[in-house]
């Protein structure tokens, strides 16, 4: 099956190479754009990184169309980085819908910079994709919903796979299956030598469920629901 055919299958909510997607507006729009041109010939199987980029871009499209963010604001990437991803992985017409010529680069705030630094410190050496994902994850982690949802992924399992692949030492430290955003902030606190938690141990903490709950919710549920964490 060609990469384009796989994306079409994914956009219809089918199971393809173990990856499932629901019929979200951003993904529908992205898959419709893919019909306008040929998918660049790569490996027979759809690369997981490429799939994640497509998920993130579909989520960004939803925010762009809603007037909530520009492409750079939604992804944490620069114009140059976004253009490079689109040129390498998507047909030419896809670029125009992101309106890159109309936007400016979005600089990270202090909190985002700390998250980005944490991820970069554990990024896979010499992998440019890991750097891009560090920026994307740091930006999307500032949103209020589950991190996997804010990345446009199908479920938390896909997020765990992404982190294990690109930030292996960081992911390996989450031995108790802590929710990822909670885990990130715990690591930041540890690096600064203090803790936000006043309980002597996790089992005695009243926030136990918020830190160690499944974080699943409904897989690929409609975007816009807030209040959860991955």
From Swiss-Prot:
The protein's name: Protein NifQ homolog
Swiss-Prot/TrEMBL GO biological process terms: nitrogen fixation
Ribonucleoprotein listed as a keyword: no
Function: Probably involved in molybdenum processing.
Family statement: Belongs to the NifQ family.
Superkingdom per UniProt: Bacteria
Keywords attached to this entry: Molybdenum, Nitrogen fixation, Plasmid
Gene Ontology terms for molecular function: molybdenum ion binding
InterPro entries: NifQ
Disulfide bridge positions per record: none
Gene (UniProt): nifQ
The keyword Transit peptide is annotated on this UniProt entry: no
């Amino acid at each position: 099956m060609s990469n384009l055919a796989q994306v079409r299958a994914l956009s219809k909510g089918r199971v393809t190479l173990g990856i499932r997607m629901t019929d979200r507006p951003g993904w529908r729009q992205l898959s419709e754009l893919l019909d306008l041109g040929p998918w660049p010939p790569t490996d027979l199987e759809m690369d997981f990184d490429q799939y994640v980029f497509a998920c993130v871009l579909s989520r960004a499209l939803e925010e762009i169309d809603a007037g909530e963010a520009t492409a750079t604001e939604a992804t944490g990437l620069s114009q140059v980085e976004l253009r490079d991803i689109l040129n390498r992985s998507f047909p030419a017409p896809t670029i125009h819908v992101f309106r890159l010529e109309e936007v400016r680069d979005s600089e990270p705030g202090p909190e985002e910079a700390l998250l980005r630094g944490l991820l970069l410190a554990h990024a896979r050496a010499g992998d440019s994709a890991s750097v891009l994902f560090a920026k994307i994850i740091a930006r999307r982690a500032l949103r209020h919903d589950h991190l996997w949802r804010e990345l446009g992924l199908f479920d938390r399992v896909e997020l765990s796979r992404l982190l294990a692949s690109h930030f292996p030492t960081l992911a390996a430290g989450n031995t108790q299956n802590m929710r990822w955003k909670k885990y990130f902030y715990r690591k930041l606190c540890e690096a600064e030598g203090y803790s936000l938690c006043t309980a002597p141990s996790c089992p005695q903490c009243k926030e136990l469920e918020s830190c160690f709950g499944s974080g699943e919710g409904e897989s690929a549920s409609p975007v816009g629901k807030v209040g959860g964490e991955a």
